[in-house]
Structure formats: C-alpha cells, structure tokens
C-alpha cells in the first residue's frame, strides 16, 4: 500500500477547526496522484498513451475528522479492475494510528482522443498491485435522485478557481459546493459522490437539495436539469 505523511493545515479546515470534507477528498486525490507519479505512470505518461483516468464514484466513511495541526498518514491501494473500470481503496490515519477515514472509489479509463471509455490493459494496472477491497457496505455507484421534494438553491457560474488541469470542475470542488447547502449542525459521517458529466468554465450550476431519512442529497445540475454531480450525505 502506498502512503505519504502530512499535517492538517489551517487552510484545509472547516469552520469547526477540523479537516473539511473537501479537504479529505483532496488528500485522497493527491495520494493516488503521488503513487502514480512515483511508479512512473503519472499524468504525463498516461496522457502520452492518449488515455486518462476519470473518477466516477466515491464512498467515504468518516469515523473522525482530523484536527488542525494533526500529523496524518494518507494511504491508497488498487483493489481490482474490470473492463474499463479501476477500483481503489483509501485510508487516512490519525496520530493515534487508527483509521479516521476509509474510502472506496471507482474510476473509468478514457481514450483521450475519442473521449470514450477504453478497456483496462495490464500496462494500466499491473504496476499498482491488487489488494482486497475495504470491508465497507457494498453500495451502487449510481445514486438515485428523488423525483420530487427538492429545494432549488441559487444558481451560480463556474469560475476559473473551480477548475483543474483537465479544464473542468475538480472532483473536490463539487464536494465543497454541495456541502454549502447542508445545515450548520449536520455532521457528515458518510458521503457518496457520483460524477456524471463535466462542468466547464462559464457553465451554470443549479443546486437542488433533498432531505433524506438519514441525511441529505444535493444534485448539482445544469440549466436543463441534468446532473453534473450527485452527492449523498449521511449523518
């Protein structure tokens, strides 16, 4: 399992002085990027093969939010592949050595020329090795959005600071956007994120919030009501 050590920075905190949900997502993303770079299959190499990995789904279970200044270890390990999909585990350990965060993710390998999924080959996955999936609840990568009962929020336009090197809204930014529509007293213990399409600079995002029996669902939609991203929050 690949890992790197870090320390929770002030710039990564939520208002409660703990590592924010989008800060957690950013650490997980950074961890898989660092592993790929160290194995010699980083972004430039994969792009040179006219391929790219895109994130489809997160399942993130939060036992404890790390504190300001806490030394943490972020770890990741591939846990399988099938057709055009790759599967990956993540863990964030606190100073006590216990797992504060556990996560499972699903990725799709794309052909960068055709911008269509392509089959995962040995050169795409073998370097990582394969571990067993974490013992998390097995859930669908598709998040169902209710047909009614949603509360529309004020629409906004995608800005440059929302974007990453792929020129679309970064995965962590969607989580940050969606979290803004939760009640201040709500504590996220699990979040699931389904990425459906790419929002670009200048696109309009229309958030719709739904109250659920165990939390909330936020659909970040385009002007026609099609979701870019759906985030399910459970307390």
Where are these regions (language model features)?
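Hot-dog-fold acyl-thioester-processing enzymes
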Residues: 1-55, 102-104, 111-186
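Acidic/His-leaning functional-site neighborhoods
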Residues: 150-232
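Small beta-barrel nucleic-acid-binding modules, principally OB-folds
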Residues: 50-65, 187-189, 193-198
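HotDog/MaoC-like acyl-thioester-processing domains
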Residues: 2-4, 57-62, 67-143, 199-201, ...
């Amino acid at each position: 399992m690949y890992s790197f050590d870090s320390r929770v920075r002030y710039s990564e905190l939520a208002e409660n002085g703990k590592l924010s949900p989008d800060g957690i997502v950013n650490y997980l993303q950074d961890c898989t990027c660092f592993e790929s770079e160290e194995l010699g299959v980083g972004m430039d190499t994969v792009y040179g093969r006219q391929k790219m990995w895109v994130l489809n789904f997160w399942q993130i279970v939060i036992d404890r939010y790390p504190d300001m200044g806490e030394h943490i270890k972020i770890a990741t390990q591939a846990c399988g592949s099938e057709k055009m999909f790759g599967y990956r585990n993540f863990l964030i350990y606190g100073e006590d050595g216990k797992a504060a965060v556990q996560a499972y993710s699903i990725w799709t390998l794309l052909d960068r020329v055709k911008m269509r999924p392509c089959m995962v080959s040995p050169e795409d996955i073998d370097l990582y090795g394969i571990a067993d999936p974490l013992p998390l609840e097995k859930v669908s990568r598709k998040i169902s959005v209710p047909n009614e009962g949603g509360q529309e929020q004020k629409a906004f336009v995608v800005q440059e600071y929302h974007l990453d090197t792929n020129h679309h809204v970064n995965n962590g930014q969607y989580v940050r956007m969606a979290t803004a529509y939760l009640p201040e007293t709500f504590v996220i213990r699990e979040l699931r994120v389904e990425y459906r399409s790419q929002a670009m600079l200048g696109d309009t995002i229309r958030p719709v919030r739904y109250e659920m029996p165990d939390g909330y669902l936020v659909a970040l939609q385009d002007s026609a009501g099609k979701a870019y991203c759906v985030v399910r929050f459970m307390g």
